[in-house]
Amino acid sequence: MGLSDELAVNIENLGFHYPGNDGVTFSGLNLKVRKGERFGLFGPNGAGKTTLLSLMTGLLSADAGDIHLLGRDVRKKNKDVNKLIGFVPQDFSYYQELSPVENLEFFGAWSGLTRQQIKTRTDELLHILGLENVRNKQVDQFSGGMKRRVNLAIGVIHNPAILILDEPTVGVDVQTRHAIINYLMELNKNGTTLIYTSHQLSEAEGLCEQVALIDSGEIIVQDSLANLLKEHRQESLENLFLELTGKEYRNDI
Protein backbone atom coordinates (compact mmCIF):
# COMPACT_ATOMS: atom_id res chain seq x y z
CA MET A 1 0.00 0.00 0.00
CA GLY A 2 1.16 3.53 -0.73
CA LEU A 3 2.00 5.98 1.97
CA SER A 4 -0.57 8.50 3.13
CA ASP A 5 -0.05 12.15 3.99
CA GLU A 6 -2.07 11.46 7.15
CA LEU A 7 0.03 11.26 10.28
CA ALA A 8 -0.07 8.06 12.30
CA VAL A 9 2.05 9.69 15.00
CA ASN A 10 2.38 13.39 15.73
CA ILE A 11 4.47 14.35 18.76
CA GLU A 12 5.03 18.04 19.45
CA ASN A 13 7.19 19.70 22.11
CA LEU A 14 7.25 16.58 24.27
CA GLY A 15 8.61 17.03 27.76
CA PHE A 16 9.26 14.23 30.25
CA HIS A 17 11.55 13.41 33.13
CA TYR A 18 11.67 10.58 35.62
CA PRO A 19 11.25 11.52 39.28
CA GLY A 20 14.59 12.27 40.87
CA ASN A 21 16.15 12.78 37.42
CA ASP A 22 16.69 9.03 37.21
CA GLY A 23 16.76 8.10 33.54
CA VAL A 24 16.46 9.82 30.19
CA THR A 25 14.85 13.26 29.87
CA PHE A 26 12.93 14.69 26.90
CA SER A 27 12.66 18.42 26.31
CA GLY A 28 10.84 19.83 23.27
CA LEU A 29 11.00 16.55 21.34
CA ASN A 30 9.16 16.43 18.00
CA LEU A 31 8.41 13.39 15.87
CA LYS A 32 6.10 12.66 12.94
CA VAL A 33 5.35 9.28 11.38
CA ARG A 34 3.09 8.95 8.36
CA LYS A 35 0.26 6.45 8.14
CA GLY A 36 1.40 3.21 6.53
CA GLU A 37 5.07 3.89 7.13
CA ARG A 38 7.77 1.53 8.38
CA PHE A 39 9.56 3.71 10.88
CA GLY A 40 12.65 2.74 12.83
CA LEU A 41 13.88 4.44 16.00
CA PHE A 42 17.51 3.53 16.58
CA GLY A 43 19.97 4.37 19.31
CA PRO A 44 22.24 2.79 21.90
CA ASN A 45 20.92 1.29 25.13
CA GLY A 46 19.71 4.06 27.42
CA ALA A 47 19.08 6.52 24.58
CA GLY A 48 15.36 6.85 25.35
CA LYS A 49 13.75 4.47 22.87
CA THR A 50 11.68 2.47 25.37
CA THR A 51 10.69 5.60 27.29
CA LEU A 52 9.43 7.26 24.11
CA LEU A 53 7.38 4.20 23.15
CA SER A 54 5.92 4.05 26.65
CA LEU A 55 4.80 7.66 26.27
CA MET A 56 3.25 6.89 22.87
CA THR A 57 1.23 4.02 24.30
CA GLY A 58 0.16 5.90 27.42
CA LEU A 59 2.10 3.67 29.81
CA LEU A 60 3.93 6.81 30.90
CA SER A 61 2.44 10.31 31.12
CA ALA A 62 4.22 13.26 29.54
CA ASP A 63 4.98 16.39 31.55
CA ALA A 64 4.41 18.66 28.56
CA GLY A 65 3.58 18.64 24.87
CA ASP A 66 1.14 16.68 22.73
CA ILE A 67 1.02 13.09 21.49
CA HIS A 68 -1.56 12.18 18.84
CA LEU A 69 -2.00 8.77 17.21
CA LEU A 70 -4.17 8.99 14.09
CA GLY A 71 -5.57 12.22 15.49
CA ARG A 72 -6.42 10.83 18.94
CA ASP A 73 -4.88 12.49 21.97
CA VAL A 74 -2.94 9.87 23.93
CA ARG A 75 -2.68 12.10 26.99
CA LYS A 76 -6.49 12.07 27.41
CA LYS A 77 -6.42 8.29 27.99
CA ASN A 78 -8.96 7.80 25.20
CA LYS A 79 -10.11 4.17 25.02
CA ASP A 80 -10.19 4.42 21.22
CA VAL A 81 -6.41 4.79 21.27
CA ASN A 82 -6.02 1.34 22.84
CA LYS A 83 -7.95 -0.20 19.96
CA LEU A 84 -5.79 1.56 17.39
CA ILE A 85 -2.41 0.43 18.67
CA GLY A 86 -0.69 -2.84 19.34
CA PHE A 87 2.35 -2.89 21.59
CA VAL A 88 5.04 -5.57 21.60
CA PRO A 89 7.28 -4.74 24.57
CA GLN A 90 10.85 -5.89 24.98
CA ASP A 91 9.84 -7.57 28.23
CA PHE A 92 7.42 -10.43 27.61
CA SER A 93 3.74 -9.55 27.98
CA TYR A 94 2.28 -13.06 28.17
CA TYR A 95 1.28 -15.17 31.16
CA GLN A 96 3.96 -17.85 31.26
CA GLU A 97 1.78 -20.44 33.00
CA LEU A 98 -0.75 -20.26 30.15
CA SER A 99 -0.59 -21.69 26.64
CA PRO A 100 -0.47 -19.55 23.47
CA VAL A 101 -4.18 -20.21 22.94
CA GLU A 102 -5.07 -19.19 26.50
CA ASN A 103 -2.95 -16.05 26.26
CA LEU A 104 -4.55 -15.01 22.99
CA GLU A 105 -8.03 -15.72 24.34
CA PHE A 106 -7.34 -13.50 27.34
CA PHE A 107 -5.81 -10.60 25.44
CA GLY A 108 -8.37 -10.89 22.66
CA ALA A 109 -11.21 -10.55 25.18
CA TRP A 110 -9.40 -7.64 26.84
CA SER A 111 -9.24 -5.95 23.43
CA GLY A 112 -13.00 -6.31 22.99
CA LEU A 113 -13.10 -9.09 20.40
CA THR A 114 -15.99 -11.54 20.27
CA ARG A 115 -15.44 -15.25 20.96
CA GLN A 116 -15.66 -16.06 17.26
CA GLN A 117 -13.26 -13.26 16.36
CA ILE A 118 -10.81 -14.52 18.98
CA LYS A 119 -10.99 -18.10 17.70
CA THR A 120 -10.54 -17.08 14.07
CA ARG A 121 -7.71 -14.70 14.82
CA THR A 122 -5.97 -17.14 17.18
CA ASP A 123 -5.97 -19.94 14.61
CA GLU A 124 -4.67 -17.53 11.97
CA LEU A 125 -1.82 -16.20 14.11
CA LEU A 126 -0.72 -19.60 15.39
CA HIS A 127 -0.45 -20.78 11.80
CA ILE A 128 1.38 -17.69 10.50
CA LEU A 129 3.85 -17.56 13.38
CA GLY A 130 4.60 -21.28 13.49
CA LEU A 131 2.98 -21.97 16.86
CA GLU A 132 0.34 -24.53 15.86
CA ASN A 133 2.25 -27.52 17.23
CA VAL A 134 2.66 -25.90 20.65
CA ARG A 135 -0.69 -24.15 20.86
CA ASN A 136 -1.68 -25.91 24.11
CA LYS A 137 1.70 -26.05 25.86
CA GLN A 138 2.69 -23.69 28.66
CA VAL A 139 4.73 -20.78 27.34
CA ASP A 140 7.34 -21.11 30.10
CA GLN A 141 8.49 -24.31 28.36
CA PHE A 142 9.35 -22.47 25.14
CA SER A 143 12.65 -21.29 23.73
CA GLY A 144 13.39 -17.57 23.60
CA GLY A 145 12.48 -17.40 19.93
CA MET A 146 9.12 -19.10 20.45
CA LYS A 147 8.36 -16.75 23.33
CA ARG A 148 9.05 -13.77 21.05
CA ARG A 149 6.51 -15.17 18.57
CA VAL A 150 3.88 -15.45 21.30
CA ASN A 151 4.67 -11.89 22.37
CA LEU A 152 4.14 -10.68 18.80
CA ALA A 153 0.87 -12.61 18.42
CA ILE A 154 -0.52 -10.92 21.53
CA GLY A 155 0.39 -7.50 20.16
CA VAL A 156 -1.51 -8.03 16.90
CA ILE A 157 -4.48 -10.08 18.13
CA HIS A 158 -6.86 -7.15 17.52
CA ASN A 159 -5.48 -6.11 14.10
CA PRO A 160 -4.15 -2.72 15.25
CA ALA A 161 -3.70 0.14 12.79
CA ILE A 162 -0.39 1.06 14.44
CA LEU A 163 2.00 -1.59 15.73
CA ILE A 164 4.69 -0.42 18.15
CA LEU A 165 7.55 -2.84 18.73
CA ASP A 166 10.35 -2.48 21.25
CA GLU A 167 13.32 -4.69 20.32
CA PRO A 168 11.10 -7.51 18.97
CA THR A 169 14.04 -9.60 17.74
CA VAL A 170 16.39 -9.25 20.71
CA GLY A 171 17.95 -12.54 21.76
CA VAL A 172 16.47 -14.67 18.96
CA ASP A 173 18.14 -16.89 16.39
CA VAL A 174 18.51 -15.93 12.73
CA GLN A 175 15.54 -18.05 11.61
CA THR A 176 13.19 -16.46 14.13
CA ARG A 177 14.49 -12.98 13.30
CA HIS A 178 13.75 -13.51 9.62
CA ALA A 179 10.31 -14.94 10.39
CA ILE A 180 9.39 -11.95 12.55
CA ILE A 181 10.67 -9.39 10.06
CA ASN A 182 8.90 -11.11 7.15
CA TYR A 183 5.63 -11.07 9.08
CA LEU A 184 6.06 -7.39 9.92
CA MET A 185 6.64 -6.61 6.25
CA GLU A 186 3.44 -8.47 5.36
CA LEU A 187 1.47 -6.52 7.96
CA ASN A 188 2.79 -3.29 6.52
CA LYS A 189 1.79 -4.30 2.99
CA ASN A 190 -1.76 -4.58 4.34
CA GLY A 191 -1.65 -1.05 5.76
CA THR A 192 -0.32 -1.41 9.30
CA THR A 193 1.96 1.41 10.41
CA LEU A 194 5.09 -0.02 12.02
CA ILE A 195 7.11 1.79 14.68
CA TYR A 196 10.12 -0.28 15.48
CA THR A 197 13.01 0.22 17.87
CA SER A 198 16.34 -1.51 18.05
CA HIS A 199 19.88 -0.82 19.15
CA GLN A 200 21.05 -2.96 16.22
CA LEU A 201 21.52 -0.49 13.37
CA SER A 202 21.96 -3.32 10.87
CA GLU A 203 18.24 -4.11 11.18
CA ALA A 204 17.34 -0.75 9.61
CA GLU A 205 18.24 -1.88 6.11
CA GLY A 206 15.37 -3.45 4.25
CA LEU A 207 12.89 -3.02 7.10
CA CYS A 208 12.50 0.71 7.66
CA GLU A 209 11.60 3.37 5.12
CA GLN A 210 12.24 6.15 7.59
CA VAL A 211 14.73 6.09 10.44
CA ALA A 212 15.54 8.35 13.34
CA LEU A 213 18.66 8.26 15.47
CA ILE A 214 18.13 9.06 19.13
CA ASP A 215 20.76 9.71 21.78
CA SER A 216 20.38 10.92 25.36
CA GLY A 217 16.70 11.74 24.85
CA GLU A 218 17.26 13.78 21.70
CA ILE A 219 16.36 12.86 18.13
CA ILE A 220 19.46 13.93 16.28
CA VAL A 221 18.32 13.16 12.74
CA GLN A 222 15.29 11.74 10.89
CA ASP A 223 14.97 10.88 7.20
CA SER A 224 14.93 7.93 4.85
CA LEU A 225 17.92 5.66 5.29
CA ALA A 226 19.06 6.26 1.71
CA ASN A 227 18.85 10.03 2.04
CA LEU A 228 20.74 10.06 5.33
CA LEU A 229 23.64 8.01 4.04
CA LYS A 230 23.79 9.91 0.75
CA GLU A 231 23.56 13.37 2.30
CA HIS A 232 26.24 12.66 4.87
CA ARG A 233 28.34 10.54 2.50
CA GLN A 234 28.45 7.64 4.90
CA GLU A 235 28.28 3.89 4.29
CA SER A 236 26.57 2.95 7.55
CA LEU A 237 24.41 4.36 10.33
CA GLU A 238 27.22 3.60 12.78
CA ASN A 239 29.49 6.03 10.93
CA LEU A 240 26.68 8.57 10.68
CA PHE A 241 26.10 8.34 14.43
CA LEU A 242 29.80 9.00 15.03
CA GLU A 243 29.73 12.01 12.70
CA LEU A 244 26.66 13.58 14.31
CA THR A 245 27.43 12.89 17.96
CA GLY A 246 31.19 12.53 18.11
CA LYS A 247 30.62 9.23 19.91
CA GLU A 248 31.27 5.69 18.77
CA TYR A 249 28.04 3.72 18.51
CA ARG A 250 27.92 0.92 21.07
CA ASN A 251 25.21 -1.69 21.60
CA ASP A 252 26.25 -2.51 25.16
CA ILE A 253 25.73 0.87 26.85
Locations of regions flagged by a protein language model:
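Helix-to-loop junction immediately C-terminal to a conserved catalytic motif
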Residues: T57
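Conserved ABC ATPase "signature" region
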Residues: E105, A109, Q116-V134
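Conserved ABC ATPase signature
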Residues: E97, Q138-F142
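A short, flexible loop at the N-terminus of ABC-type nucleotide-binding domains that lies
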Residues: L3-A8, G15-G28, N78
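Conserved ABC transporter NBD signature motif
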Residues: G65-K76, D80-V81
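Catalytic Walker B motif of ABC-type/P-loop ATPase nucleotide-binding domains
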Residues: L163-E167
